[in-house]
């Protein structure tokens, strides 16, 4: 923010009755993050020195959910309008700082639009964010005289002539703290709703001869609020469309932009291809020439250059080096690490496990608390038995090891370089280099065996 605009107020006390939810309205998520968190993050991006969060309904849950956020919690015990909400925060305003007012249920407002608003605010006056709508129904109208803003009239209080005005108030404004405190003290509730409107300060400022300058958002969606789940879903689609368009323009190939969800941050290289119905959560990095198959979910992971993730794979808190292949239907859980050219096939699950250079776990395998060296083959049905019901134990497999199908490795256990484990083995002791270990039951042949025959009832 500019040197004079140091604090932000976020109004977030509403119950959200039309959401039909026990969750406070502003905690409902858009793109995997609560609406109010979007606004808090925008305030941070402006460099706000202090953020005042006005809360009411569901206060304990609000604090539990957002407790780690560096905000000043301001209680609005009764919801008596936006002006009343600002009155609760006013004691925290410094006279010589500018105050930017935002809303916890208007999540798509951008840093760029707010910087424009702050820039137009005149000394001693108000910067007001407005927008022109073909259908302004339901919004407060901007009243001008000779081009100057002189007031705002709410829909329910507007005259027939005022209802024809298409310039509407978004509710977002910036003003000096000392001026705000003076104007807020003069508000009354002499209106149809019997509420204290923050918009009434516009007329008060005009009466003092103060200038009100306006700015407009880059996109209309920036000023759209949420009162019900239908509106939230609509904003979700708008947000996802904007993210998809941005990624396409940056060179990411989304095979169907309408079927892609970004619920975090995606950092990408060149020639990345993402198929349909992929969900990105948290912080995800995709290297050059990465391919992501349909239906994959990627969360807080790094995928190296040239790696291919086949359909319906879930990767969370994992790191993949270059030219890895994973899936389809694989699951890499937190702590999974794949070295260059490692392969994880269908129905393989890894947790706190690493796979060395060129190693393969092709199918139907669980690797937990396991270190696997280079050029290892893990046969189908291999299980590392890492949990005894109380504690976890580690399995270590060296380089150039062959693990036969249907092997159970009962941790803690180590398999040294070059060892071979025969199919069907239950391994309970360490294996030396280049040893062959087989523990299956001796095969028995019985000639002329006759199967039992069911008795007829």
Swiss-Prot record:
Signal peptide: none annotated. Residues 1-229 are annotated as: Pyrophosphorylase. Residues 251-457 are annotated as: N-acetyltransferase. Pathway: Nucleotide-sugar biosynthesis; UDP-N-acetyl-alpha-D-glucosamine biosynthesis; N-acetyl-alpha-D-glucosamine 1-phosphate from alpha-D-glucosamine 6-phosphate (route II): step 2/2; Nucleotide-sugar biosynthesis; UDP-N-acetyl-alpha-D-glucosamine biosynthesis; UDP-N-acetyl-alpha-D-glucosamine from N-acetyl-alpha-D-glucosamine 1-phosphate: step 1/1; Bacterial outer membrane biogenesis; LPS lipid A biosynthesis. CDD domains: GT2_GlmU_N_bac, LbH_GlmU_C. The active site is at 363 (proton acceptor). Its EC number is 2.7.7.23, 2.3.1.157. UDP-N-acetyl-alpha-D-glucosamine binds at residues 11-14, 25, 76, 81-82, 103-105, 140, 154, 169, 227, 333, 351, 366, 377. Its cofactor is Mg(2+). GO terms for biological process: cell morphogenesis; cell wall organization; lipid A biosynthetic process; peptidoglycan biosynthetic process; regulation of cell shape; UDP-N-acetylglucosamine biosynthetic process. Binds 1 Mg(2+) ion per subunit. Keywords: Acyltransferase, Cell shape, Cell wall biogenesis/degradation, Cytoplasm, Magnesium, Metal-binding, Multifunctional enzyme, Nucleotidyltransferase, Peptidoglycan synthesis, Repeat, Transferase. Catalyzes the last two sequential reactions in the de novo biosynthetic pathway for UDP-N-acetylglucosamine (UDP-GlcNAc). The C-terminal domain catalyzes the transfer of acetyl group from acetyl coenzyme A to glucosamine-1-phosphate (GlcN-1-P) to produce N-acetylglucosamine-1-phosphate (GlcNAc-1-P), which is converted into UDP-GlcNAc by the transfer of uridine 5-monophosphate (from uridine 5-triphosphate), a reaction catalyzed by the N-terminal domain. In the N-terminal section; belongs to the N-acetylglucosamine-1-phosphate uridyltransferase family. In the C-terminal section; belongs to the transferase hexapeptide repeat family. This is Bifunctional protein GlmU. The lineage of its organism: Bacteria, Pseudomonadati, Pseudomonadota, Gammaproteobacteria, Enterobacterales.
């Amino acid at each position: 923010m500019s040197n004079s605009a140091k604090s932000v107020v976020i109004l977030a006390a509403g119950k959200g009755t039309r959401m039909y939810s026990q969750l406070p309205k502003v905690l409902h998520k858009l793109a995997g993050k609560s609406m109010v968190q979007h606004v808090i993050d925008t305030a941070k991006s402006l460099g706000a020195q202090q953020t005042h969060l006005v809360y009411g309904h569901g206060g304990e849950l609000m604090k539990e959910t957002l407790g780690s956020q560096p905000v000043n919690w301001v209680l609005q015990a009764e919801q008596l309008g936006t002006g009343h909400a600002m009155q609760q925060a006013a004691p925290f305003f410094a006279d010589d700082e500018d105050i930017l007012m935002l809303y916890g249920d208007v999540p798509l407002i951008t840093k760029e639009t707010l910087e424009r608003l702050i820039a137009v605010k005149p000394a001693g006056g108000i910067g007001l964010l407005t927008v022109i709508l073909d259908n302004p129904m339901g919004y407060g109208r901007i009243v001008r005289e000779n081009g100057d803003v002189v007031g705002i009239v709410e829909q329910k209080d507007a005259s027939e002539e005022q209802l024809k005005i298409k310039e509407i108030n978004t509710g977002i404004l910036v003003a000096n703290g000392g001026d705000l405190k003076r104007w807020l003290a003069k508000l009354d509730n002499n209106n149809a709703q019997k509420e204290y409107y923050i918009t009434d300060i516009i007329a008060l400022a005009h009466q003092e001869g103060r200038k009100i300058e306006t700015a407009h958002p880059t996109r209309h969606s920036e000023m759209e609020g949420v009162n019900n789940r239908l509106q939230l879903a609509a904003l979700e689609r708008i947000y996802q469309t904007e993210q998809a368009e941005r990624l396409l323009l940056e060179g990411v190939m989304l095979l169907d932009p309408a079927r892609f969800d970004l619920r975090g941050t995606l950092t990408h290289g060149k020639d990345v291809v993402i198929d349909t119905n992929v969900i990105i959560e948290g912080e995800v990095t995709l290297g050059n020439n990465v391919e992501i198959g349909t239906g994959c979910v990627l969360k807080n992971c790094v995928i190296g250059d040239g790696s291919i993730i086949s359909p319906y794979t879930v990767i969370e808190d994992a790191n993949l080096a270059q030219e890895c292949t994973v899936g389809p239907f694989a699951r890499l859980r937190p702590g999974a690490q794949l070295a260059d050219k490692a392969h994880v096939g269908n129905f393989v699950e890894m947790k706190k496990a690493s796979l060395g250079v060129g190693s393969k776990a092709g199918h139907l395998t669980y690797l937990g608390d396991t270190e696997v060296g280079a050029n290892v083959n893990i046969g189908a049905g291999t299980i590392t038995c890492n949990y005894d019901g109380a504690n976890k134990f580690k399995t270590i497999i060296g380089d150039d090891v062959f693990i036969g199908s249907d092997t159970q490795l009962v941790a803690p256990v180590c398999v040294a370089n070059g060892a071979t484990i025969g199919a069907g083995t239950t391994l309970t002791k360490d294996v030396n280099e280049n040893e062959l270990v087989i523990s299956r039951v001796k095969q028995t042949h019985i000639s002329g065996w006759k199967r039992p025959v069911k008795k007829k009832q």
